[in-house]
Curated annotation (Swiss-Prot):
The keyword rRNA processing applies. Residues 1-172 are annotated as: Disordered. Residues 22-31, 51-66, 73-83 have a biased composition (Basic and acidic residues). This is rRNA biogenesis protein RRP36. The keyword Plastid does not apply. Belongs to the RRP36 family. One of its GO terms (biological process) is maturation of SSU-rRNA from tricistronic rRNA transcript (SSU-rRNA, 5.8S rRNA, LSU-rRNA). It comes from Zygosaccharomyces rouxii (strain ATCC 2623 / CBS 732 / NBRC 1130 / NCYC 568 / NRRL Y-229).
């Protein structure tokens, strides 16, 4: 008895249902026969043919992997171009609205790629770039002229005292030639002091301008004081050297350390009593501080 006749059950099934069941059974039998035949064929194959098939499969897999790597390494634009070429026959069949949408999205993607390229970090060894719209400054840098750190290259400088014009300049000669400028500086100081003392005038002026006048007054006073102190030191040293070189054939010149001591001695002798007391007190405190430091180290 076959499988079909064993599983027949009494019921109210139509003839069409019975026909469908028969077709299913026949299909199953055919599939079982095909599987058995394929198993028999594999059993008959030799080991050499199986090895050849295995090597062929491995080669195909390696080729697929290389293609995938190449596709990944390619730039995004090239991949898009190739994909567009492959999908060209399919896009021809699509409507015009679809093509317009794709163009719109392509434009957006190209813009994004352009922005990403701009944002990329430049190499530090790349040449410097500058816009052509930027104006060239009127004050140019002279190559080979090295200014000291204290001097600001942006400030205006008198060409008569510029290093690029010639050899080294003697400060004493310049001071002797342009000593009359001290009178103008003194007049400026007096004018600024009169402006600051006048309350009516300062109330009318803005606070920023008043602050700038105060700063300028302070700087001019300090500049004038330093110039006068330098002149005094030069005169003291000059007088001392003249007295020493009266009878001597060889000229005698003081060292820097000796000059400093001579100037300090002269200033101390020409001080008032109160000023001397202040100087002595300051020196005493300084000496005590040094002694305390020495005691701490010895501990």
């Amino acid at each position: 008895m076959s499988y079909y006749f064993k599983n027949i059950k009494p019921g109210v099934e139509s003839e069409s249902d019975e026909g469908e069941d028969l077709e299913r059974l026949l299909r199953r039998n055919n599939q079982d026969d095909a599987d058995e035949s394929s198993d028999d064929e594999l059993r008959t194959l030799s080991f050499g043919s199986l090895k050849k098939a295995d090597t062929m499969m491995k080669k195909e897999e390696d080729g697929d992997r290389k293609l995938n790597r190449k596709i990944k390494d390619k730039p995004s634009k090239q991949v898009k171009y190739e994909s567009e070429q492959e999908s060209a026959p399919e896009q021809e069949s699509e409507s015009e609205s679809g093509s317009s949408d794709s163009e719109f999205f392509e434009e957006e993607s190209s813009k994004k790629n352009g922005d990403q390229k701009k944002k990329k970090k430049r190499s530090k060894h790349a040449p410097a770039e500058q816009s052509a719209k930027k104006r060239v400054s009127k004050v140019r840098e002279i190559p080979g002229l090295h200014l000291s750190k204290s001097q600001n290259p942006n400030l205006y400088q008198d060409i008569r005292f510029d290093k690029s014009t010639g050899g080294p300049t003697d400060s004493s000669v310049i001071r002797r030639r342009y000593g009359f400028l001290d009178e103008y500086r003194q007049k400026e100081i007096e004018e600024m002091e009169s402006i600051l003392h006048d309350r009516k005038l300062t109330s009318k002026l803005p606070p920023e301008e008043v602050e700038s006048i105060e700063r300028r007054l302070k700087s001019t006073k300090s500049r004038l004081q330093t110039m006068k102190s330098k002149d005094l030191e030069q005169n003291i040293v000059k007088d001392y050297e003249q007295t020493m070189n009266k009878d001597n054939k060889n000229k005698f010149h003081l060292k820097r350390s000796e000059r400093r001591k001579l100037v300090q001695k002269w200033k101390f002798e020409h001080m008032k009593s109160k000023q001397r007391e202040k100087v002595m007190e300051r020196k005493r405190k300084k000496r005590l501080g040094k002694e305390f430091k020495q005691f701490e180290f010895n501990k």
